[in-house]
Every structure is written in structure tokens, then in C-alpha cells.
């Protein structure tokens, strides 16, 4: 007998999307326990009960050149999802971020008459704003996590709902600073610096050697500083091993506990991405670094219309955290900025005050709201579909 329980197709293509989608799934199951999920999933979504059709970690690439080298993987994932939509005809398709892939899939879902909920908007406010109208043709509801995104969709007649930011609920640690430092076997009387090279293999290759060289420079000036490196769920310790050889830093690699690591840190150096907002919500001062293929970077410069690259700075509307981009993200500059931050308590406190203002801007949190929106769409409620 065929299963009549609602079926949701879901896609997340990044580590952060995997995390947000997993929380969404668990919250939906609290409201409607029978709902089934299948799609492109990472480890956290699989743990939440998604039937995985493709491993999202194989899609976690950034930049034009990097994407071109993974086209076979991306094409294979798209074919699997299209086949799933055509064969199973799910009651709802939820797309989490990952716009280049997801908007193409949304177009296919539209032709099949499948409702589409897009959770975490493409950054239309930063570049290619014309996409708002294209999105309106293939998406039934846009659930945004930043309040300033709402007008972009309202003006284009696209149904939009500000659900709050998922990180408001997700970013927390049970430890205070000293407890976290002791938890990881370090001395709470010494400063601790977090090194966060990113969650993608391409980021590790590009950023980890630079971070380690910067840490060695810092260590030569301040040998009492301790180092923590949280390992993303998309990576394994063996992925880092070749880069760590030859370094004698007081460094610990900590898998799957990024927020506890942040709680232990007096400051961090982090790759640009979701982690910069996580740091802001944890109140951890940081230096942001960004390096990618030169061609990808310069093409991005021509298209992107924002003054900052770090999400925490974009939301704040100012450069709260220093950004070191491309050639400026050198071991020398990173070491200098990190040392200045570690040595200047007043500067760290000012940054923390501005981070608190960011936290206030983001609302109460998204988990329950996005889950209720999902269930409402499954139940066929009229949510104001634009004509």
C-alpha cells in the first residue's frame, strides 16, 4: 500500500544549509510527525531523518572556476533531484540557499505543479537584482532571514515572510569562556585564538596554510597564545593532516563543536561566510579573511554591489570586523591584525557591543516560524501567492 503521508523534497548544498535544514526538519516533525523528507542532504539532515539522494558535501564549492571543475557532480545531483520530483511528485519542495542550483530546480518543480518554499534568500540585494522577478515566477513563498530583504521581494510582488534568523536559536554553548578553555585542555589564564579556515575542501587548501603560517608568526611574538581549530561536519581530521605537518603550535583540532570552540576564544581569524555571523552572535571578536581564484574574484567584483564581504559587516552596515581580501590575506597581515585585536581589550569590547546590536536586528529566531510555514503550505493554506 502506498504511503499517503506528506512528502517534502529538500535541498541544501552547503554545511550551513545542512545545519539550518536539519533544524527545520526536526521542528516540522514536532508539529506534523508523519511528514517524510528526501533530497540532497549533509550529515545533519541525514541524522534528522532525510532520505538522502545525494551527499551535499560533494557540492560545497565556491567561485566560477571551482564550480566548473565540479560540473559532473553538480549535473548528477540535478538529474537525481529532477527524477525524484518527476517520479515521487512531492507535496512541497524546500530549497535552502544554494541559489544557482536551487533556482534551476525550482523552475522544474514549477512545470510539474509542485509548490516551492525557498528558505534563506539568494543575496539579490548584493548582486543581480533582476533575479527577484525570475524568482517570483518559480517560487511560491520566499522565507527570508534578514529584515532588509523583505522590500526587495515586496516591490516585485513576490510572497515573502521574514522568519527571523535560524542562527539565533542554533548559536550557543553551555560553557562560559573559562569553562570552555578548560574543556579543551588549555590554560584559562592565557589568550586563545580560533582559526577557522572554512567548511569546504577548496577553502582548506587555500586558507589553512596561510592561517597556520600566520599563527606561527603570532606564536613567535606571543608564545603563551593557544590555538583552537573547529572542524566542520563536512570535513575529517585526515583532510587537515597534510597541512598540519611541520607545525609545532599549541593547536587542537576539535570536531563538531564549533560553538564551544567559539566560547573559548578571545578572538578568531575566520574565512568569510556564515561563520562571521555566528561569531557576532557569540560575541567573539574576529578578523575576516577571503581568498579565491583570481578570475572568480575579479568577476565577482564586477557584479557585487555591497561594501563589505563579511555577513556580520553587511548586517551592521559598517566594517565592524576587519576584512583581509585576496593578497591582503597574507600571513603577515593576518598575524598583525590578530595580534592587534588580542592586545587591545577596548577594541574587542567595542566590537562586542556592535555585535550585540546585530543580534537585536535579527529577530527572535526562525525555527518555529519556518516549520509552521512549511506545515501551512503542506496543508494548502492560501499564503498570498502573487499572480
UniProtKB/Swiss-Prot annotation:
Pfam entry (one): LpxB
Superkingdom per UniProt: Bacteria
Taxonomic path: Bacteria, Pseudomonadati, Pseudomonadota, Gammaproteobacteria, Chromatiales
Gene: lpxB
GO molecular function, one term: lipid-A-disaccharide synthase activity
InterPro entries: Glyco_trans_19
Enzyme Commission code: 2.4.1.182
Enzyme class, spelled out: transferase
Family to which this protein belongs: Belongs to the LpxB family.
Role played: Condensation of UDP-2,3-diacylglucosamine and 2,3-diacylglucosamine-1-phosphate to form lipid A disaccharide, a precursor of lipid A, a phosphorylated glycolipid that anchors the lipopolysaccharide to the outer membrane of the cell.
UniProt name for this protein: Lipid-A-disaccharide synthase
GO-annotated biological processes: lipid A biosynthetic process
Keyword Glycosyltransferase: yes
GO CC entries: membrane
Keyword terms: Glycosyltransferase, Lipid A biosynthesis, Lipid biosynthesis, Lipid metabolism, Transferase
